[in-house]
Amino acid sequence: MAGRAGRTRPRTLRDAIPDCALRSQTLESLDARYVSRDGAGDAAVWFEDMTPAELEVIFPTTDAKLNYLSRTQRLASLLTYAGPIKAPDGPAAPHTQDTACVHGELLARKRERFAAVINRFLDLHQILRG
């Protein structure tokens, strides 16, 4: 892409903004200085990939990484909120049971399976790092 002065623009804003400016200036001043408002050949925005190298081996595509994040978020919510429903004081309310319901058992089984898979990945991680 050619700029207005006949010089080529960098492909990304990372190429255009010096590291010292990134560390010293505010986001507003960087925006005002480096982002064009007329839409003429703006540089692309970049996002840092913060995925550990071990996960790059296991999840090479962006889709696989997003699926992994989705599954781990679901697991975290299950671990947080899957406890039995009990009344705060006194005996169990009519809509709750003292024994685990079918849904609770299914969640517990899924949690155990997921923990087993994660343990295998951690074992693989130790082998790769070893």
Curated annotation (Swiss-Prot):
| Gene Ontology CC, one term | host cell nucleus
Keyword Chaperone appears in the UniProt entry: no
Give the UniProt keywords, A-Z. Answer: Host nucleus, Viral genome packaging, Viral release from host cell
| Domain of life where this protein originates | Viruses
Places the protein is found: Host nucleus
Q: Which Pfam families match?
A: Herpes_UL33
GO BP term (any one): viral DNA genome packaging
Q: What does this protein do?
A: Component of the molecular motor that translocates viral genomic DNA in empty capsid during DNA packaging. Forms a tripartite terminase complex together with TRM1 and TRM3 in the host cytoplasm. Once the complex reaches the host nucleus, it interacts with the capsid portal vertex. This portal forms a ring in which genomic DNA is translocated into the capsid.
Q: How does it assemble?
A: Associates with TRM1 and TRM3 to form the tripartite terminase complex.
Family assignment from sequence similarity = Belongs to the herpesviridae TRM2 protein family.
This one is known as Tripartite terminase subunit 2
Q: What organism is this sequence from?
A: Human herpesvirus 2 (strain HG52) (HHV-2)
